[in-house]
Regions:
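Predominantly flavin-linked oxidoreductase catalytic cores and closely associated redox partners
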Residues: 9, 102-248
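Generic enzyme active-site microenvironment
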Residues: 29, 154, 276
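N-terminal Rossmann-fold NAD(P) dinucleotide-binding loop
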Residues: 13
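A short alpha-helix-loop-beta-strand transition element characteristic
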Residues: 35, 52-67, 112, 169-173, ...
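Glycine-rich FAD pyrophosphate-binding loop
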Residues: 5-7, 21-40
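C-terminal helical "tail/cap" subdomain of flavin- and related membrane-associated enzymes
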Residues: 307-471
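A conserved beta-strand/loop capping segment in the N-terminal third of enzymes
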Residues: 46-100
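FAD/FMN-dependent oxidoreductases across multiple families
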Residues: 117, 226-305, 309-310, 316
Length: 471
């Protein structure tokens, strides 16, 4: 009987393990942190709820309103009028645990362990031996163990050890930084079904910042390319300031950071080793979405293993596994390319960002955006809509090029009046805890002992992502 090791217990690894175990294949699922709380916007599209049979209990909020805020703080509201449609907001620790446990219930061996080394054999064609530290006993040091397997699915995130073992090649990464800020009930009511996206060089020179609602707190974060990593805390302070009028009574309960892949790796299958999720580089440009594509890639890879192994009775070849890559690229390659083009156009400077937010005020653009995200499908348009969208896009490009030198500066938001904010600050209202910023950049914010700070860099941390469709 075929034996498969799935390294990494996030959405991609768990969904792969579920398919394999359900087919009766001996499946070992490795995850170092079973309480994984990866920094991630936590947005999932509506189609994922049905496609992956997710219960409503894991969805904290059903977002039907998205507010886009431009560099000058112009606000554009995008609404989902159909009450059956929504963007699901979840906590990664809840979603990941559900998917892992479902795979285990179907027969996958769930190992609380960290894979430290992989022997790949001659020319990486096997046999494959995993060296790992087993933490099942609860001891801090763990117990060293080995396991020989026929195939390996690498679902261990951007810092993938499996990718290194198979010489998959490097890729550029972005850095996602996020604070979880707990708000009193009267403030959380504002975010009942609302998420916010902010654009501007003050919050990210090449991405966007977000305020996404969770169960009893909001995730407030930003992302930028690795070359700008030294700026990340200043950018986080930028989104704090832009969104401050709704966060003044908040308290930071966790600070998180994580790398995000910017494009697929050069090699995603070598021998009988295959990469999925963040390890493979399946995060979309422009939106940073990763959860759905992680889960989908894990499932597609596992389905190919089941099919090519005749249900586990034979060992698939490298050529067999590469069929999964061909199917993936055919299905989603155009989506990744289009979103990369859009990022290059609309995130190039603040003038282009301003034009982009204005575009989002158009109802046809809103419907196109939401349908594409919610259902992961290409939305057809009539000739008039196509012409209008083309003109709007060209206008944004021209405006971005013409106005870029002038430079935009944020203006006060209209969420609360200046008088209201002054009154709140007079009685000591302020965000408590969180990041520390250099004295030369922005005012520092002390980190209280009660705040939990998590900088995630481990090899078995899974998919990421700030996500909307907008990880």
């Amino acid at each position: 009987m075929l034996r498969v090791a799935v390294v990494g217990g996030g959405p991609s690894g768990s969904c792969a393990a579920e398919v394999l175990a359900k087919a009766g294949i001996e499946t070992w699922l490795f995850e170092r942190k079973l309480d994984n709380a990866k920094p991630c916007g936590g947005a999932i599209p509506l189609c994922m709820v049905a496609e992956f049979d997710l219960p409503e209990s894991i969805i904290d909020r059903k977002v039907r309103n998205m507010r886009m805020i431009s560099p000058s703080n112009r606000e554009v509201d995008i609404h989902l009028d159909n009450q059956d449609e929504y963007i699901g907001m979840c906590r990664r620790e809840v979603l990941d645990a559900f998917l892992r446990n479902r795979a285990a219930d179907l027969g996958a061996h769930l190992v609380n362990g960290l894979v430290t080394k992989i022997d790949t054999g001659t020319a990486r064609q096997g046999p494959y031996t995993l060296h790992y530290t087993d933490y099942s006993s609860g001891e801090a040091t763990g117990e060293p163990r080995t396991l020989e397997v026929d195939l390996i699915v690498g679902a261990d995130g951007a810092n993938s050890r499996v990718a290194r073992a198979m010489d998959a090649g490097d890729y550029n990464v972005a850095i996602a930084f996020q604070e979880r800020i707990k708000l009193p009930p009267e403030e959380m009511a504002y975010y009942e079904d609302l998420a916010e996206m902010y654009v501007g060089t003050d919050v990210s020179p090449d991405f966007y910042a977000w305020v996404f609602p969770k169960f009893d707190h909001v995730a407030v974060g930003t992302g930028t390319m690795q070359k700008n990593q030294s700026l990340i805390k200043g950018l986080q302070q930028g989104i704090r300031e832009r969104a401050a009028k709704r966060l003044l009574k908040g308290e930071v309960i966790k600070v998180e950071a994580h790398p995000i892949p910017e494009h697929p790796r050069p090699r995603r299958v070598v021998g009988r080793m295959a990469l999925v999720g963040d390890a493979a580089g399946y995060v979309t440009k422009s939106s940073g979405e990763g959860i759905y594509f992680a889960a989908k890639s894990g499932r597609m890879c596992a389905e190919q293993i089941v099919a090519s192994s005749a249900g586990g009775s034979r060992i698939p070849t490298e050529a067999d596994l590469k069929v999964y890559i061909k199917k993936w690229d055919k299905l989603y390659g155009p989506t990744y390319k289009v979103l990369e083009i859009l990022q290059n156009i609309f995130y190039s400077n603040d003038a282009a960002r301003e034009a982009f937010v204005e575009m989002c005020d158009d109802k046809d653009v809103q419907r196109l955006t939401f349908d594409s995200y919610l259902y992961k499908r290409v939305v057809t348009m009539n000739p008039w809509q196509q012409l209008k969208l083309t003109c709007l896009t060209l206008g944004a490009v021209l405006r971005g090029q013409a106005l870029a030198p002038s430079g935009y500066r944020p203006v006060p938001s209209a969420v609360r009046s200046a008088a209201e904010v002054e009154a709140m600050e007079a009685v000591g209202a302020a965000i408590k805890g969180g990041i520390r910023t250099p004295q030369t950049a922005r005012p520092s914010v002390p980190v209280p002992e009660t705040s939990s700070v998590t900088i995630v860099t481990g090899t078995q941390e899974e998919e990421r992502e700030p996500a909307l469709a907008g990880k």
